[in-house]
Amino acid sequence: MTDLNIPHTHAHLVDAFQALGIRAGQALMLHASVKAVGAVMGGPNVILQALMDALTPDGTLMMYAGWQDIPDFIDSLPDALKAVYLEQHPPFDPATARAVRENSVLAEFLRTWPCVHRSANPEASMVAVGRQAALLTANHALDYGYGVESPLAKLVAIEGYVLMLGAPLDTITLLHHAEYLAKMRHKNVVRYPCPILRDGRKVWVTVEDYDTGDPHDDYSFEQIARDYVAQGGGTRGKVGDADAYLFAAQDLTRFAVQWLESRFGDSASYG
């Protein structure tokens, strides 16, 4: 039978998700590499459907979407070109704005899934489907989109999980929430203009956040994740052809905050 090169099936994926520890009713944030999973009978959307079936209708699936076309660079443009952007660039519309391509095609698939909910922070936007999707995505502040009351904070509060499905460990978005919480020296604050819809009209607002695009020179998310795994955190398995990790969001966040503060906190020694 192995000579037939049968693609991974829906049933096989459901079994693999359950073997990893995914259970009915969980709230789960997914990071995924479709390429790493391998060929799937029916296409990549079957991965999402299999995961939702493992979670059951009582569960919730969330992914980072962001905004593919966010014009956060316009302050660096020549004045004449910036003026064109200010006049012509469309606003962020949660119903239509595309998910960031680099973060997996599955994020765009989930964005267009029936009954999807999407949070209103353009750069830190999350999409979610399931019982707690509305709770996770509601009232997402424009400033400090990975902080208090963000979808990530809510995922931690409801004791949700993070699934890394063939995705690199340096892409765990939840660790931005840990960075927000950690009392560290020299957090870099950035401000950028962003067009949003307000009462049906485009308005430009200034968004303030910690700089998530310029990671600290002295650490990486992958290093935090591997240290967490080394001390027994999470579970590891195989889904399709992909290496997969399942992390409890609350425990991973607690570990990451302690990890960051012990090295870069106010009381940490300078090395």
UniProtKB/Swiss-Prot annotation:
Family per similarity comment: Belongs to the antibiotic N-acetyltransferase family.
Superkingdom to which the source organism belongs: Bacteria
Effect of D72W: No effect in catalytic activity with gentamicin as substrate
Function: Resistance to antibiotics containing the 2-deoxy-streptamine ring including dibekacin, gentamicin, kanamycin, sisomicin, tobramycin and neomycin, but not to amikacin or netilmicin. Acetylates a broad range of both 4,5- and 4,6-disubstituted aminoglycosides, including neomycin, paromomycin, ribostamycin, sisomicin, gentamicin, tobramycin and kanamycin, with no preference of one disubstitution over the other. Acetylates sisomicin and kanamycin most and least efficiently, respectively. Does not modify plazomicin.
Phenotypic consequence of D170F: No effect in catalytic activity with gentamicin as substrate
Protein name in the entry: Aminoglycoside N(3)-acetyltransferase III
GO biological process entries: 2-deoxystreptamine metabolic process; acetyl-CoA catabolic process; antibiotic metabolic process; cellular response to antibiotic
Reaction(s) catalysed by this chain's protein: a 2-deoxystreptamine antibiotic + acetyl-CoA = an N(3)-acetyl-2-deoxystreptamine antibiotic + CoA + H(+)
Family annotation (Pfam families): Antibiotic_NAT
Amino acids binding CoA: H31, A32, S33, V34, K35, S104, V105, F109, T171, T173
